[in-house]
Amino acid sequence: MAIILTNLYRTVAAGIVLALVLLAAVIVLGEVDIGSAFGGRITWAYLFVWIHVASGVMWIGLLYYFNFVQMIQMPKIPAEQKPAVSKFIAPEVLWWFRWAAMSTIVTGLIVAWLRGYLHDAYMLGFADGFDVPTFFIGVGMWLGTIMWFNVWFVIWPNQKKALNINNAYPDLPQAQKDRAARLAMLFSRTNMMLSIPLLLAMTGGGLNYGNSGL
């Protein structure tokens, strides 16, 4: 077991294997026809839901790490120790953070398209008369889209400046770095705020859609 758990990638691979074993058990014990189980839109939607949820957990988890841990603790770290965070930890976290956001939004749109509610959800359930589940999931989709935009077009570009990631801004004045850091912080806090109604909307909307048999 140690040979698996001491390596991140082997640990992830083991988790995927366990998930596939669980799926196989459901197919066998539930006497599910394999042909129907691995064909059609519903199966593809389920696969992308799985990826969507995993990506979302990483995205929101790292968002909460930034807001609940790093932002609060950075002022307490001695100046000579801060480069350990700003030069090594933060750039790596930001890589996973922004690509988890991208994976979440892309797979979410694919799921909405496969399950047939992409247009109606972005119309907030008003396309053919008001529909509560579609409104719920639509609010979540709009909030997620706004948060994704903030990550890619505000937080990430400004963090690159503030931390001089990949030495992209070696001559940027400190005043501009400070402004970039503050802007990134404010939009990270904005995403933190939006994530709370987002999670309510997504879980509520998902339960409604699950009950409708879509």
What are these regions (language model features)?
Residues 1-214:
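Polytopic transmembrane helical bundles with strong interfacial aromatic enrichment
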